[in-house]
């Protein structure tokens, strides 16, 4: 009644929302992926090494007709300079670092194995936080190291692997960013040092 008295229609439950996705134009991505894999059998056991690296050299979102119109409006002052983003040169902006790598080393002797691995990335920038000088906020490089130990045995005709491990060995926090979680949740893991036990039985 209060809505009608104010000349407004009462609101109710939203039954349908239409939000059409528009692919504004092409995105160009260039870079190099490299991988090094090496296994070595020795008198004391087997060593396995792996190193994978992804290096981006270009990540560019083309304007297209719609974005060009909006860009011209920003340059003329009709729209604020921060009205739209996510186009032009977006290399290392809001994710997609120039360099990401994964490195692991594993040693196995008989029924026992030890392993260590590391994930790392280079600096990325976010355009939601701009300094007075016009510079984007730099989200510093981040890397985490994990270690584990495996034991293999047979159980009722099946192969059992028992793993005890520690993730984020150095107990590092993800770098600060102005996202809803306080860090780039799509890029970094903010889980502190944690221990786990994993059992895998294969028949």
Where are these regions (language model features)?
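Generic long, charged, amphipathic alpha-helical segments
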Residues: 118, 127-145
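A cross-taxa feature marking solvent-exposed loop/turn segments within ectodomains of secreted
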Residues: 42-44, 140, 155-157
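Short, low-complexity, polar/charged sequence segments that are solvent-exposed and flexible
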Residues: 69-72, 133-136, 181-185
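C-terminal beta-signal and adjacent terminal beta-strands/loops
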Residues: 57-60, 117-129, 151-203
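Residues that define the transmembrane beta-barrel architecture of outer-membrane proteins
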Residues: 28-32, 97-101, 141-145, 158, ...
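Gram-negative outer-membrane beta-barrel transporters
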Residues: 1-128
